[in-house]
Amino acid sequence: MEYINLYDVTKCTGCRGCQVACKQWNQLPANIVPFSGGYSTKEDTDAKTFTIIKYFEEEDANGKVTWRFRKHQCLHCGDPACMKVCPREAIFITDFGAVAKDYDKCVGCKYCVAACPFEIPKYDGEIDKVTKCEMCVDRMKVFMEKPDSTDPAKQRDKYNYVPACAKTCVTGSIKFGPKDQLLKEAEARVAFLKANGSPNANIYNPSGVGGVHKVYVLADAPEKYGLPSNPTIPSYINVWQPWIKPYGGILIGLAALGAVGSFFSTRIIKAMRIGEHEGGKTHDA
């Protein structure tokens, strides 16, 4: 059965509890960063920060300020570009839908960094690996092993093992559950928002990447929350898979040429990406 995280921006208070819970569960160190002048603690995720809350401030012609929050992390695409380009097959989709990694196989080539339409994976030079949110696969292993139960106590115990961000959210902004069930809840929520002053409310579950397993309920257009309106798997990946990927793996397997192979292969990806964008094709990244 597929599961998703459903994040409703209209219920989020920007408390950053999910950000802290993610750090704690994954045993990630704190980052000391310079003050950026905004309200976000960080401008973007990094190799040791998998989840952040982004703040967006908009002032209208009358001087009225609108605040928007958004939880920013890997969206766990149904058809992940990162997995398609990985020459070591270190990236895989779990039984419940998360996009996870086998860190023993990862060689830090950064192909996934270049390919992701959301620019999520980040390289960690200290361990020579690329990291990202994995939807707490260790917690989810326990969750999946526990059967559903009509006994409320047993069912609560099962749901103690949902991803840390969902477990800690006090407002109900982040929910975790069966995909079909939560998508129905999302549709009902959007209908409610449209009827109550948010005519542009929508579900962010882009089909261009095969749908996602971190679905958003947005009160306005995706661009208002710093999201691409129509992200797609770049067409160059169709070239990459049959022609370049096999040789990329061979290069990485040769210690003497690994750095060279990674250097040129990632630049091939980036060059194709830029060329596609300049050529006028749809591309949001």
Predicted regions and their residues:
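Non-ligating segments of multi-cofactor redox enzymes
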Residues: 1-285
